[in-house]
Amino acid sequence: MNVDLIFPNWPAPPRVHAMIATQRGAGPSIDRASFRETLALPSEPCWLRQVHGTRVVAFDRQAGDERATATRDFLPPLAGEGARRADGGNTATKADEPDADASITRIPGIVLAIQTADCLPVLFCADDASEIAAAHGGWRGLSAGVMENTLAAMRAPRENIMAWLGPAIAAQSYEVGDEVRDAFLSHDPAAASAFTATRPGHWLCDLYALARQRLHAAGITHIFGGGLDTFTDSRLHSYRRDGAHSGRMVSLVWILPASI
């Protein structure tokens, strides 16, 4: 399994570890069987069946159990969720993977995972390493409130939470229709600043700017990352560039146990 790694440039506490893994030469299906061993992860990643929604799940683990399980559910999914796969994907999922687009945990050793190939992965952590979260920011989920729902599920005060914006398609590569712009402007007219007109009914959409805007409005001031372009960077997977043959990047975050 050949993997390239990107490490977030953020001032996370030493006990919080995070990375973006890109499997070279891979198609839509990630080699999960060797994923943990290759990356020396403390446990199997907690995969989600991402559906471009706003549902958040919490992962917990009973003492002695190897596999983390989703034990709590924060906020119901959007009406009609579950029919649409994230990033147009065909990535294989298991029946016990929850339909959700964000997850949180406060348990050291549990690895949260988000898969993307143009959409925006966002990682969160409390500055005391007490909890972490990971969210999938496709335009549907982002406009509908997946970031706000993720923050609502976290216990840490907003001023003690930091966010890192992972690799996503950049504005110059992401032309969208009126329906995308309208979805954001219906929530906040200020979102208009993240769209640049190209031709009638079409706009360049800045996912990074939209995420920062929503996070700032939710009380998050410590925001990092957000400068890559999956479409033009050959290291990164892009569904818009490569279509159904595109691979997936995996954003991972976990808490190390406290020193004894």
Stretches found by the model and what they are:
Residues 1-79, 84-260:
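Active-site microenvironment for binding and transforming phosphate-containing groups
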